[in-house]
Amino acid sequence: MRILAISGSLRDASYNTALLRALREEAPEGVEVDIWQGLKVIPPYDQDEDLVPGPEAVEAFRELVRESDAVFFSTPEYNSSIPGALKNALDWGSRPVATNVFRNKPVAVISASAGAFGGVWAGAELRKVLGAMGARVTEAELAVGHAHEKFTEDGVIEDLDLRQGLSDALQTLVTSVLDRAAAA
């Protein structure tokens, strides 16, 4: 099973990207987690360019989503919402409507921020957007508050409860993929 992991952050030292690295370590046998960090190269959405094929970076992104069995998102919170670069990529992936690569795709959403609430509003907003796009949003939820305190200098998570929360979120997504395959 192939899961595409997308961080909503552009920062090199992103807590959300670090969470996805830890998630990859928690992956059970037979589950491959590929972290995509290409938000920076996706051009601003332009309906005039809303074609198939679209811009090269957009087509590469669409293909990654299309080839994955599921998508796992980890997002920071900016002004009580998701980062613009992430929303931009989602707009490209869901358009044109007839070729929406997220339709019926199982997805999971977690969030992390330096604040006490851990990006909970951004997580809720991302779930809403993904649902409106036709993705199959799982019940997996994890909001990591005070994220800057959760990692060692090497980016390792020592908090066993947090590691378990990541593992649980991943298992929820894996189960969703397996249930979808069994129903087909």
PLM feature spans:
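A general structural signal for well-ordered alpha-helical segments in protein cores
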Residues: I3, N16, L20, V58, ...
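Glycine-rich phosphate/pyrophosphate-binding loop and the adjoining helix
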Residues: L4, R136-A184
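N-terminal beta1-alpha1 ligand-phosphate binding loop
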Residues: M1-V31
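N-terminal beta-loop-helix "entrance" segment that forms/cooperates
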Residues: G38-P55, K150-D154
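Short beta-strand elements in bilobed, periplasmic/extracellular small-molecule ligand-binding domains
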Residues: V31-P44, V137-G145
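Helix-loop-strand module that forms the ligand-binding subsite of alpha/beta enzymes
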Residues: P53-M133
